[in-house]
Design a protein with these regions (language model features):
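Inter-Walker segment of RecA-like/P-loop motor cores
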Residues: 86-108, 360-370
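ATP-hydrolysis module of ASCE/P-loop NTPase motor domains
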Residues: 31, 51, 92-99, 117-187, ...
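Conserved helix-turn-beta segment of the N-terminal RecA-like "Helicase ATP-binding" lobe
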Residues: 64-96, 117
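Walker A/P-loop NTP-binding motif
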Residues: 33-49, 419-420
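Walker A/P-loop
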Residues: 18-37
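Conserved Walker A/P-loop ATP-binding site and its immediately adjacent core
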Residues: 54-71, 103-107
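Conserved helicase NTPase motor core
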Residues: 4-8, 13-14, 19-23, 50, ...
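Conserved ATP-driven helicase/translocase motor core recognized via long
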Residues: 53, 172-362
Length: 432
Protein backbone atom coordinates (compact mmCIF):
# COMPACT_ATOMS: atom_id res chain seq x y z
CA UNK A 1 0.00 0.00 0.00
CA UNK A 2 1.38 3.39 -1.07
CA UNK A 3 2.22 5.91 1.64
CA UNK A 4 -0.10 8.94 1.70
CA UNK A 5 2.05 12.03 2.15
CA UNK A 6 0.74 15.26 3.61
CA UNK A 7 0.68 18.37 1.42
CA UNK A 8 3.79 19.72 3.19
CA UNK A 9 5.65 16.41 2.82
CA UNK A 10 4.73 16.20 -0.86
CA UNK A 11 6.09 19.69 -1.40
CA UNK A 12 9.38 18.77 0.30
CA UNK A 13 9.68 15.62 -1.82
CA UNK A 14 9.06 17.32 -5.17
CA UNK A 15 10.66 20.79 -4.86
CA UNK A 16 13.72 21.19 -7.07
CA UNK A 17 16.55 23.65 -7.74
CA UNK A 18 16.74 25.24 -4.32
CA UNK A 19 18.38 24.71 -0.93
CA UNK A 20 15.93 23.15 1.52
CA UNK A 21 16.03 22.67 5.28
CA UNK A 22 13.26 20.49 6.71
CA UNK A 23 12.77 21.07 10.42
CA UNK A 24 10.37 18.77 12.26
CA UNK A 25 10.05 16.90 15.54
CA UNK A 26 11.54 13.46 16.15
CA UNK A 27 9.30 10.68 14.87
CA UNK A 28 7.55 12.91 12.32
CA UNK A 29 8.89 11.00 9.32
CA UNK A 30 11.72 13.33 8.26
CA UNK A 31 14.02 10.49 7.20
CA UNK A 32 11.20 8.75 5.32
CA UNK A 33 10.62 11.98 3.39
CA UNK A 34 14.34 12.21 2.61
CA UNK A 35 14.34 8.64 1.26
CA UNK A 36 11.24 9.36 -0.82
CA UNK A 37 12.88 12.47 -2.25
CA UNK A 38 15.87 10.36 -3.29
CA UNK A 39 13.57 7.81 -4.92
CA UNK A 40 11.58 10.53 -6.69
CA UNK A 41 14.78 11.89 -8.23
CA UNK A 42 15.98 8.44 -9.28
CA UNK A 43 12.60 7.46 -10.77
CA UNK A 44 11.66 10.83 -12.27
CA UNK A 45 9.89 10.10 -15.57
CA UNK A 46 11.19 13.28 -17.22
CA UNK A 47 14.70 13.78 -15.79
CA UNK A 48 15.84 10.70 -13.84
CA UNK A 49 19.10 10.92 -11.89
CA UNK A 50 21.61 8.13 -11.37
CA UNK A 51 21.99 7.38 -7.67
CA UNK A 52 25.76 7.85 -7.85
CA UNK A 53 25.05 11.50 -8.73
CA UNK A 54 23.68 11.99 -5.20
CA UNK A 55 25.80 12.54 -2.08
CA UNK A 56 23.76 11.24 0.86
CA UNK A 57 25.22 11.73 4.33
CA UNK A 58 24.12 10.89 7.85
CA UNK A 59 25.83 10.54 11.23
CA UNK A 60 26.04 6.80 11.94
CA UNK A 61 26.96 3.77 9.88
CA UNK A 62 23.77 2.07 11.02
CA UNK A 63 21.64 4.95 9.70
CA UNK A 64 23.54 4.96 6.40
CA UNK A 65 23.11 1.19 6.08
CA UNK A 66 19.39 1.40 6.83
CA UNK A 67 18.94 4.16 4.24
CA UNK A 68 20.74 2.12 1.59
CA UNK A 69 18.50 -0.87 2.38
CA UNK A 70 15.33 1.24 2.12
CA UNK A 71 16.36 2.61 -1.27
CA UNK A 72 17.38 -0.83 -2.52
CA UNK A 73 14.05 -2.36 -1.43
CA UNK A 74 12.11 0.37 -3.22
CA UNK A 75 14.19 -0.06 -6.38
CA UNK A 76 13.74 -3.83 -6.22
CA UNK A 77 9.97 -3.41 -5.98
CA UNK A 78 9.90 -0.92 -8.86
CA UNK A 79 12.01 -3.27 -10.99
CA UNK A 80 9.65 -6.17 -10.22
CA UNK A 81 6.82 -4.07 -11.66
CA UNK A 82 8.89 -2.99 -14.68
CA UNK A 83 11.59 -5.66 -15.20
CA UNK A 84 12.74 -4.33 -18.60
CA UNK A 85 13.47 -0.82 -17.32
CA UNK A 86 17.18 -0.32 -18.10
CA UNK A 87 17.46 2.78 -15.91
CA UNK A 88 16.21 0.85 -12.86
CA UNK A 89 18.52 -2.06 -13.68
CA UNK A 90 21.41 0.40 -13.75
CA UNK A 91 20.40 1.84 -10.34
CA UNK A 92 20.39 -1.64 -8.80
CA UNK A 93 24.01 -1.95 -9.91
CA UNK A 94 25.02 1.56 -8.81
CA UNK A 95 23.36 1.31 -5.36
CA UNK A 96 26.27 -0.79 -4.09
CA UNK A 97 28.85 1.93 -4.78
CA UNK A 98 26.61 4.98 -4.30
CA UNK A 99 27.78 7.50 -1.72
CA UNK A 100 25.29 6.80 1.04
CA UNK A 101 27.69 7.35 3.88
CA UNK A 102 28.59 8.99 7.16
CA UNK A 103 30.24 12.41 7.17
CA UNK A 104 33.55 10.88 8.25
CA UNK A 105 33.14 8.29 5.50
CA UNK A 106 32.82 11.08 2.95
CA UNK A 107 35.86 12.87 4.42
CA UNK A 108 37.80 9.63 4.04
CA UNK A 109 36.72 9.48 0.38
CA UNK A 110 37.97 13.04 -0.21
CA UNK A 111 41.32 12.31 1.47
CA UNK A 112 41.85 9.01 -0.41
CA UNK A 113 41.35 10.80 -3.73
CA UNK A 114 43.27 14.00 -3.01
CA UNK A 115 45.81 13.17 -0.26
CA UNK A 116 48.66 14.32 -2.52
CA UNK A 117 47.39 17.91 -2.37
CA UNK A 118 48.22 18.19 1.34
CA UNK A 119 51.30 15.97 1.46
CA UNK A 120 49.61 13.23 3.48
CA UNK A 121 51.06 9.71 3.62
CA UNK A 122 48.44 7.52 1.86
CA UNK A 123 49.28 4.63 4.18
CA UNK A 124 47.45 6.25 7.11
CA UNK A 125 44.87 4.37 9.16
CA UNK A 126 42.02 5.50 11.39
CA UNK A 127 42.86 5.02 15.06
CA UNK A 128 40.29 3.44 17.36
CA UNK A 129 38.93 5.19 20.45
CA UNK A 130 41.00 3.20 22.92
CA UNK A 131 44.25 3.92 21.11
CA UNK A 132 43.43 7.64 20.88
CA UNK A 133 42.57 7.84 24.56
CA UNK A 134 45.89 6.30 25.58
CA UNK A 135 47.75 8.59 23.20
CA UNK A 136 46.00 11.67 24.61
CA UNK A 137 46.80 10.60 28.18
CA UNK A 138 50.48 10.12 27.30
CA UNK A 139 50.68 13.53 25.60
CA UNK A 140 48.93 15.28 28.51
CA UNK A 141 51.19 13.63 31.06
CA UNK A 142 54.31 14.66 29.14
CA UNK A 143 52.93 18.18 28.59
CA UNK A 144 52.27 18.85 32.27
CA UNK A 145 55.58 17.29 33.34
CA UNK A 146 57.43 19.64 30.98
CA UNK A 147 55.62 22.69 32.32
CA UNK A 148 56.30 21.65 35.92
CA UNK A 149 59.98 21.15 35.08
CA UNK A 150 60.24 24.59 33.47
CA UNK A 151 58.83 26.22 36.61
CA UNK A 152 56.73 28.66 34.58
CA UNK A 153 55.30 31.16 37.11
CA UNK A 154 52.01 31.65 35.23
CA UNK A 155 51.55 27.88 34.99
CA UNK A 156 52.28 27.40 38.70
CA UNK A 157 49.75 30.09 39.64
CA UNK A 158 47.20 28.54 37.28
CA UNK A 159 47.60 25.09 38.89
CA UNK A 160 47.48 26.46 42.45
CA UNK A 161 44.28 28.41 41.76
CA UNK A 162 42.33 25.93 39.65
CA UNK A 163 43.49 22.39 40.44
CA UNK A 164 41.15 20.34 42.60
CA UNK A 165 43.09 19.59 45.79
CA UNK A 166 46.48 18.02 45.10
CA UNK A 167 45.43 16.55 41.76
CA UNK A 168 45.76 18.28 38.40
CA UNK A 169 43.45 15.80 36.62
CA UNK A 170 40.63 18.35 36.42
CA UNK A 171 42.96 20.75 34.61
CA UNK A 172 43.86 18.05 32.10
CA UNK A 173 40.15 17.50 31.52
CA UNK A 174 39.72 21.24 30.88
CA UNK A 175 42.50 21.09 28.28
CA UNK A 176 40.80 18.16 26.55
CA UNK A 177 37.38 19.84 26.67
CA UNK A 178 38.74 23.04 25.15
CA UNK A 179 40.65 21.04 22.54
CA UNK A 180 37.47 19.15 21.56
CA UNK A 181 35.52 22.42 21.33
CA UNK A 182 38.19 23.99 19.15
CA UNK A 183 38.23 21.03 16.77
CA UNK A 184 34.54 21.51 15.97
CA UNK A 185 35.57 24.81 14.37
CA UNK A 186 37.09 25.11 10.89
CA UNK A 187 40.25 26.85 12.12
CA UNK A 188 40.86 25.69 15.71
CA UNK A 189 43.86 27.90 16.49
CA UNK A 190 42.04 31.05 15.34
CA UNK A 191 39.05 30.06 17.44
CA UNK A 192 41.27 29.62 20.50
CA UNK A 193 42.83 33.03 19.88
CA UNK A 194 39.32 34.47 19.73
CA UNK A 195 38.55 33.00 23.16
CA UNK A 196 41.46 34.95 24.63
CA UNK A 197 40.55 38.08 22.70
CA UNK A 198 37.11 38.12 24.32
CA UNK A 199 38.75 38.49 27.73
CA UNK A 200 41.32 41.13 26.75
CA UNK A 201 39.54 44.34 27.70
CA UNK A 202 40.49 47.84 26.61
CA UNK A 203 40.65 49.78 29.92
CA UNK A 204 38.97 52.79 28.31
CA UNK A 205 36.15 50.92 26.55
CA UNK A 206 35.56 48.10 29.02
CA UNK A 207 33.52 44.98 28.34
CA UNK A 208 30.79 46.61 26.26
CA UNK A 209 33.08 46.87 23.21
CA UNK A 210 34.11 43.20 23.20
CA UNK A 211 32.85 40.77 20.56
CA UNK A 212 31.59 38.53 23.35
CA UNK A 213 29.37 41.26 24.79
CA UNK A 214 27.87 42.10 21.40
CA UNK A 215 27.30 38.40 20.68
CA UNK A 216 25.51 38.09 24.02
CA UNK A 217 22.77 40.47 22.90
CA UNK A 218 22.31 38.53 19.67
CA UNK A 219 21.74 35.40 21.77
CA UNK A 220 19.29 37.30 23.98
CA UNK A 221 17.37 38.68 20.99
CA UNK A 222 17.03 35.22 19.47
CA UNK A 223 15.86 33.68 22.76
CA UNK A 224 13.27 36.40 23.36
CA UNK A 225 11.90 36.02 19.83
CA UNK A 226 11.49 32.30 20.45
CA UNK A 227 9.72 32.98 23.76
CA UNK A 228 7.40 35.46 22.03
CA UNK A 229 6.56 32.96 19.29
CA UNK A 230 5.71 30.32 21.89
CA UNK A 231 3.55 32.83 23.75
CA UNK A 232 1.63 33.74 20.59
CA UNK A 233 1.17 30.06 19.75
CA UNK A 234 -0.30 29.43 23.21
CA UNK A 235 -2.66 32.41 22.87
CA UNK A 236 -3.86 31.19 19.47
CA UNK A 237 -4.75 27.82 21.01
CA UNK A 238 -6.66 29.64 23.78
CA UNK A 239 -8.70 31.36 21.07
CA UNK A 240 -9.85 28.08 19.49
CA UNK A 241 -13.42 26.88 20.02
CA UNK A 242 -12.43 24.41 22.76
CA UNK A 243 -9.38 26.36 23.90
CA UNK A 244 -8.78 27.48 27.52
CA UNK A 245 -9.73 31.14 27.03
CA UNK A 246 -9.30 31.92 30.74
CA UNK A 247 -5.55 31.28 30.39
CA UNK A 248 -5.26 34.35 28.15
CA UNK A 249 -4.91 36.79 31.04
CA UNK A 250 -1.72 35.13 32.33
CA UNK A 251 -0.34 34.73 28.81
CA UNK A 252 -0.89 38.42 28.05
CA UNK A 253 1.04 39.32 31.20
CA UNK A 254 3.83 37.00 30.02
CA UNK A 255 3.87 38.88 26.72
CA UNK A 256 4.21 42.21 28.53
CA UNK A 257 7.23 40.79 30.39
CA UNK A 258 8.81 39.49 27.18
CA UNK A 259 8.39 42.89 25.51
CA UNK A 260 9.87 44.61 28.54
CA UNK A 261 12.92 42.35 28.24
CA UNK A 262 13.11 43.05 24.50
CA UNK A 263 13.24 46.79 25.21
CA UNK A 264 16.06 46.26 27.70
CA UNK A 265 17.88 44.12 25.15
CA UNK A 266 17.50 46.80 22.46
CA UNK A 267 19.09 49.30 24.86
CA UNK A 268 21.68 46.71 26.00
CA UNK A 269 20.80 47.59 29.58
CA UNK A 270 22.72 44.80 31.28
CA UNK A 271 22.13 45.76 34.92
CA UNK A 272 18.39 46.22 34.47
CA UNK A 273 18.24 42.91 32.62
CA UNK A 274 19.93 41.27 35.61
CA UNK A 275 17.43 42.89 37.96
CA UNK A 276 14.44 41.73 35.90
CA UNK A 277 15.60 38.19 35.18
CA UNK A 278 16.73 37.53 38.76
CA UNK A 279 13.30 38.58 40.04
CA UNK A 280 11.06 36.84 37.53
CA UNK A 281 7.46 36.46 38.58
CA UNK A 282 4.80 34.80 36.46
CA UNK A 283 1.04 35.16 36.83
CA UNK A 284 -0.85 32.00 37.79
CA UNK A 285 -3.07 30.39 35.19
CA UNK A 286 -6.76 30.60 35.99
CA UNK A 287 -8.06 27.73 38.12
CA UNK A 288 -11.72 28.51 37.39
CA UNK A 289 -13.77 25.67 36.00
CA UNK A 290 -14.01 25.91 32.21
CA UNK A 291 -16.98 24.31 30.49
CA UNK A 292 -16.55 22.82 27.04
CA UNK A 293 -12.78 23.15 27.11
CA UNK A 294 -10.53 20.42 25.75
CA UNK A 295 -8.28 18.91 28.41
CA UNK A 296 -5.73 18.18 25.70
CA UNK A 297 -5.62 21.85 24.64
CA UNK A 298 -5.27 22.94 28.28
CA UNK A 299 -2.27 20.66 28.70
CA UNK A 300 -0.79 21.84 25.42
CA UNK A 301 -1.03 25.50 26.44
CA UNK A 302 0.55 24.72 29.81
CA UNK A 303 3.44 22.88 28.16
CA UNK A 304 4.06 25.66 25.64
CA UNK A 305 3.98 28.28 28.40
CA UNK A 306 6.48 26.30 30.49
CA UNK A 307 8.82 26.16 27.48
CA UNK A 308 8.62 29.96 27.14
CA UNK A 309 9.19 30.46 30.87
CA UNK A 310 12.20 28.13 30.77
CA UNK A 311 13.77 30.29 28.05
CA UNK A 312 13.57 33.36 30.28
CA UNK A 313 14.82 31.50 33.34
CA UNK A 314 17.71 30.08 31.32
CA UNK A 315 18.79 33.56 30.22
CA UNK A 316 18.96 34.63 33.85
CA UNK A 317 20.90 31.59 35.04
CA UNK A 318 23.34 31.56 32.11
CA UNK A 319 24.12 35.18 31.37
CA UNK A 320 22.69 37.60 33.92
CA UNK A 321 23.76 36.65 37.44
CA UNK A 322 25.88 39.65 38.42
CA UNK A 323 26.19 43.37 37.71
CA UNK A 324 28.09 44.74 34.72
CA UNK A 325 30.81 46.01 37.05
CA UNK A 326 31.19 42.57 38.64
CA UNK A 327 31.18 40.95 35.20
CA UNK A 328 33.99 43.26 34.09
CA UNK A 329 36.04 42.41 37.19
CA UNK A 330 35.47 38.68 36.65
CA UNK A 331 36.47 38.98 33.01
CA UNK A 332 39.70 40.78 33.88
CA UNK A 333 40.48 38.22 36.59
CA UNK A 334 39.82 35.35 34.16
CA UNK A 335 42.06 36.67 31.38
CA UNK A 336 45.34 35.32 32.82
CA UNK A 337 44.12 31.79 33.59
CA UNK A 338 42.34 31.60 30.23
CA UNK A 339 45.52 32.59 28.38
CA UNK A 340 47.37 29.78 30.17
CA UNK A 341 44.58 27.28 29.43
CA UNK A 342 44.63 28.25 25.75
CA UNK A 343 48.43 28.03 25.68
CA UNK A 344 48.29 24.52 27.16
CA UNK A 345 45.55 23.53 24.71
CA UNK A 346 47.52 24.76 21.69
CA UNK A 347 50.64 22.98 22.92
CA UNK A 348 48.64 19.80 23.50
CA UNK A 349 47.09 20.03 20.02
CA UNK A 350 50.50 20.32 18.36
CA UNK A 351 52.05 17.47 20.36
CA UNK A 352 49.01 15.25 19.81
CA UNK A 353 49.13 15.96 16.08
CA UNK A 354 52.86 15.16 15.97
CA UNK A 355 52.31 11.84 17.78
CA UNK A 356 49.56 10.85 15.34
CA UNK A 357 51.80 11.75 12.40
CA UNK A 358 54.57 9.57 13.86
CA UNK A 359 52.19 6.62 14.04
CA UNK A 360 50.54 7.58 10.72
CA UNK A 361 47.08 7.51 12.28
CA UNK A 362 44.13 9.89 12.01
CA UNK A 363 41.06 10.48 14.14
CA UNK A 364 37.67 11.65 12.84
CA UNK A 365 38.46 15.27 13.59
CA UNK A 366 41.69 15.04 11.57
CA UNK A 367 39.73 13.64 8.65
CA UNK A 368 37.30 16.56 8.72
CA UNK A 369 40.08 19.14 8.86
CA UNK A 370 42.20 17.45 6.18
CA UNK A 371 39.13 17.27 3.94
CA UNK A 372 38.54 20.96 4.64
CA UNK A 373 42.17 21.73 3.76
CA UNK A 374 41.70 19.90 0.46
CA UNK A 375 38.41 21.60 -0.42
CA UNK A 376 39.09 25.15 0.70
CA UNK A 377 41.84 27.64 -0.09
CA UNK A 378 42.33 30.14 2.74
CA UNK A 379 44.36 33.30 2.29
CA UNK A 380 44.03 35.56 5.31
CA UNK A 381 40.32 36.03 5.95
CA UNK A 382 39.36 35.07 2.39
CA UNK A 383 38.27 31.48 1.64
CA UNK A 384 37.58 30.11 -1.84
CA UNK A 385 36.68 26.61 -3.08
CA UNK A 386 39.65 24.65 -4.39
CA UNK A 387 39.84 22.90 -7.75
CA UNK A 388 39.10 19.63 -5.92
CA UNK A 389 35.93 21.19 -4.49
CA UNK A 390 34.86 22.31 -7.96
CA UNK A 391 35.41 18.82 -9.37
CA UNK A 392 33.31 17.23 -6.62
CA UNK A 393 30.62 19.88 -6.93
CA UNK A 394 30.19 18.96 -10.61
CA UNK A 395 29.95 15.29 -9.64
CA UNK A 396 26.81 15.68 -7.48
CA UNK A 397 23.34 16.55 -8.69
CA UNK A 398 22.26 17.01 -5.06
CA UNK A 399 23.82 16.88 -1.59
CA UNK A 400 21.52 15.46 1.10
CA UNK A 401 22.16 15.46 4.85
CA UNK A 402 20.13 13.64 7.51
CA UNK A 403 20.14 14.75 11.19
CA UNK A 404 21.40 18.22 10.25
CA UNK A 405 20.96 19.42 13.85
CA UNK A 406 23.95 17.25 14.87
CA UNK A 407 26.37 18.87 12.42
CA UNK A 408 29.09 21.33 13.40
CA UNK A 409 30.51 24.26 11.47
CA UNK A 410 33.33 22.20 9.93
CA UNK A 411 30.83 19.70 8.53
CA UNK A 412 28.56 22.47 7.25
CA UNK A 413 31.42 24.13 5.36
CA UNK A 414 32.49 20.76 3.92
CA UNK A 415 28.96 20.12 2.66
CA UNK A 416 28.73 23.62 1.20
CA UNK A 417 32.00 23.25 -0.72
CA UNK A 418 30.99 20.09 -2.57
CA UNK A 419 27.49 21.39 -3.35
CA UNK A 420 26.18 23.64 -6.10
CA UNK A 421 27.05 26.63 -3.92
CA UNK A 422 30.49 26.50 -5.55
CA UNK A 423 29.02 27.48 -8.93
CA UNK A 424 25.77 29.24 -7.96
CA UNK A 425 23.49 26.20 -8.06
CA UNK A 426 21.05 25.45 -5.26
CA UNK A 427 21.08 21.74 -4.51
CA UNK A 428 21.43 21.20 -0.75
CA UNK A 429 18.72 19.23 1.07
CA UNK A 430 18.87 18.90 4.87
CA UNK A 431 16.55 17.39 7.44
CA UNK A 432 16.86 17.90 11.17
Amino acid sequence: MAVKWTEEQEKVITLRDRNILVSAAAGSGKTAVLVQRILSKIMDSVKPVDIDRLLIMTFTRAAAGEMRERIERALDQALAEDPDNEHLQRQMTLIHTAQITTIDGFCSYVIRNYFHLIGLDPGYRTADEGELKLLQEDVLKELFEDYYAEGDEDFTTFVECYAAGKSDESLKEHVLDLYDASMSNPWPEEWLDGCVENYCLDPEKGIVETKWYQSLWEIVDSALKEAEELNRSAMEICGESEGPELYLDALQKDLVLIRQLQELSDKQDYDQMVQTLQNLSFARLSTKKMEGVSGQLKSLVKDIREDAKDILKDLGSRYFQCSLEELTELTLASAGPLKMLVKLTKDFAQRFSDKKREKNVLDFSDMEHFALEILLKKEGDICTPSQAARELSEKYDEVLLDEYQDSNLVQEILMQNVSGWVNDRKNIFMVG
